[in-house]
C-alpha cells in the first residue's frame, strides 16, 4: 500500500503566515488555506489504496519534526502544502519541490 504523508504547512498561530490585509480584510491564516487543500486531497484519495498520514495538527511543529513523523509513518511521499507570499507587495512567491531518500 502506498503511504502519503500530508502536511498543511505552518501552524495556525505561526507569526506572519497570513494573507495581506489589503487583499483579504480577514487576514486568513496560511494554515487554513493549506488545511483545506490537504483535507480535499485526503477526501479524493479516501476511496483508494493510498493510506493518508496527516502530519499537521494546527500547531507550529518544526520542519525536522514533521519530516521525522513522515519517516516514522514509513511514508512513500511527503507532501507539504504552502501558500507563499508575493501578491501585491509581498516579497516571497513560487513553488518548491525537494526530493530525497534512497
Each language-model region and where it sits:
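Active-site histidine-acidic residue metal-binding/catalytic motifs
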Residues: 1-68, 73
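A short, glycine/acidic-enriched catalytic loop
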Residues: 13-29, 85-102
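Short acidic/polar active-site loop segments enriched in Thr and Asp
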Residues: 76
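Glycine-rich, N-terminal phosphate-binding loop of Rossmann-like dinucleotide-binding domains
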Residues: 82
Amino acid at each position: 500500500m502506498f503511504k502519503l504523508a500530508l502536511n498543511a504547512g505552518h501552524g495556525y498561530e505561526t507569526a506572519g503566515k497570513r494573507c495581506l490585509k489589503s487583499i483579504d480584510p480577514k487576514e486568513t491564516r496560511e494554515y487554513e488555506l493549506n488545511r483545506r487543500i490537504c483535507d480535499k486531497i485526503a477526501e479524493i484519495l479516501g476511496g483508494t489504496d493510498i493510506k493518508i498520514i496527516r502530519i499537521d495538527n494546527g500547531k507550529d511543529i518544526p520542519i525536522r519534526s514533521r519530516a521525522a513523523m513522515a519517516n516514522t509513518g514509513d511514508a512513500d511521499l511527503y507532501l507539504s502544502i504552502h501558500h507563499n507570499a508575493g501578491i501585491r507587495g509581498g516579497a516571497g512567491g513560487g513553488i518548491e519541490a525537494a526530493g530525497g531518500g534512497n
